[in-house]
């Protein structure tokens, strides 16, 4: 078996550690813990790192297409590696959840998230595993775009770092056990 673990975000220093980039932050953490280095693949418009865990090939992906076109990279990689949507796990921000909350889901709608909309459009289904990380709603008078492309304040950043540890554990549990349902039961909350 092979798995594709995709963190959503926007490439470039301008977007480093913004709220919209928590998917990138988590994939970076997973790869750092495993001592993996990313290589840029221009054909697949992604940064890619890979390893074997329990005899399974695992690809860690950060699309470089910008958030709203993430589906192009995800579809191309699924096709190239001959993978099914069952082999896909996407990690991304959710502004409808409180900062630091996580939710693992086996499938679901885009919920207004343009990166997820793009993936659904390109792979033709919303039936793929995902981990949502709460970034909270914009403060009164702030646009959604300004909010998601903004940095965390100090307290929220500390909360997110703790959350990334929890999500790291959840993803590793899934990769070790191969059982996403059990990971959902153990880590949702």
Curated annotation (Swiss-Prot):
Signal peptide: none annotated. InterPro entries: Pept_tRNA_hydro (IPR001328), Pept_tRNA_hydro_CS (IPR018171), Pept_tRNA_hydro_sf (IPR036416). It catalyses: an N-acyl-L-alpha-aminoacyl-tRNA + H2O = an N-acyl-L-amino acid + a tRNA + H(+). The gene is pth. It is an enzyme of class 3 (hydrolase). It is found in: Cytoplasm. The record marks 93 as: Stabilizes the basic form of H active site to accept a proton. Coiled coil: none annotated. It comes from Streptococcus gordonii (strain Challis / ATCC 35105 / BCRC 15272 / CH1 / DL1 / V288). Gene3D superfamilies: Peptidyl-tRNA hydrolase. GO terms for molecular function: peptidyl-tRNA hydrolase activity; tRNA binding. Hydrolyzes ribosome-free peptidyl-tRNAs (with 1 or more amino acids incorporated), which drop off the ribosome during protein synthesis, or as a result of ribosome stalling. Catalyzes the release of premature peptidyl moieties from peptidyl-tRNA molecules trapped in stalled 50S ribosomal subunits, and thus maintains levels of free tRNAs and 50S ribosomes. It holds the Pfam family Pept_tRNA_hydro. This is Peptidyl-tRNA hydrolase. The keyword GTP-binding does not apply.
């Amino acid at each position: 078996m092979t798995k594709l673990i995709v963190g959503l975000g926007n490439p470039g220093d301008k977007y480093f550690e913004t709220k919209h980039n928590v998917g990138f932050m988590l994939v970076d953490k997973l790869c750092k813990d495993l001592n993996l280095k990313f290589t840029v693949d221009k054909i697949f418009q992604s940064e890619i790192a890979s390893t074997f865990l329990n005899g399974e090939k695992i690809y860690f992906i950060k699309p470089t297409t910008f958030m709203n076109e993430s589906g192009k990279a995800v579809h191309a990689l699924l096709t190239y590696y001959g993978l099914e949507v069952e082999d896909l796990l996407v990690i991304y921000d959710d502004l409808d959840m409180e900062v630091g909350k996580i939710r693992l889901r086996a499938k679901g709608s885009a919920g207004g998230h343009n990166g997820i909309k793009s993936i659904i459009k390109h792979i033709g289904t919303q039936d793929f595993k995902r981990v949502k990380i709460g970034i909270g709603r914009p403060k009164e008078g702030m646009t959604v775009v300004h909010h998601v492309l903004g940095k965390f304040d100090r307290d929220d950043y500390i909360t997110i770092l703790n959350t990334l540890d929890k999500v790291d554990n959840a993803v590793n549990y899934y990769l070790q056990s191969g059982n996403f349902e059990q990971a959902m039961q153990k880590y949702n909350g």
